[in-house]
Amino acid sequence: MSRVANNPITVPKGVEVTLGDGIAVKGPLGSMSQPMSSDVTVALNDGVLTFAPVGSSIQANAMAGTLRALVNNMVQGVSKGFERKLTLVGVGYRAQAQGDALNLSLGFSHPVVHKMPAGIKVETPTQTEIVIKGIDRQAVGQVAADVRAYRPPEPYKGKGVRYSDEVVIKKETKKK
């Protein structure tokens, strides 16, 4: 059995899990659902979710671990939420949140406007910091990666958009 699927998920107070054709999770921050694989059986007993593969195939084991990880992310998302912080490094690089869009000045001849998908909120505490929040871990990470892709950190001066916890390894300039 998958080592990930061996760990049961304890459902926190205020979070409601419903099993049916799929798994629906409802909490204080919102609700999410995930279709269930026929290779995995899910049981809910006294606020504890357990996952077990049907049969002993490699695919069933893998699906059990994958489904457990996805459901755990859903439970965390609807109870606490997820956030990703980005930092802008460079002269004149600025960010400004306007409703459901993010306005970026990244040294191009035009401002870059990035629309946020449904369920994702963006804040700019300062002009060089961006905080992306939401209940869907995958969507938060994808939006952060999309924003970073406009101007990834370059290896000589480190200018660009980077994750706040990212370490940019700088190269030495060419010597004569």
Curated annotation (Swiss-Prot):
Gene Ontology MF: a single term: rRNA binding
Keywords: Ribonucleoprotein, Ribosomal protein, RNA-binding, rRNA-binding
Gene Ontology cellular-component terms listed: cytosolic large ribosomal subunit
GO BP field: cytoplasmic translation
SUPFAM superfamilies: Ribosomal protein L6
Ranges in coiled-coil conformation: none
Pfam family membership, one: Ribosomal_L6
Function noted in UniProt: This protein binds to the 23S rRNA, and is important in its secondary structure. It is located near the subunit interface in the base of the L7/L12 stalk, and near the tRNA binding site of the peptidyltransferase center.
Protein family membership: Belongs to the universal ribosomal protein uL6 family.
Subunit-structure text: Part of the 50S ribosomal subunit.
Protein name: Large ribosomal subunit protein uL6
Origin species: Thiobacillus denitrificans (strain ATCC 25259 / T1)
Gene that this sequence comes from: rplF
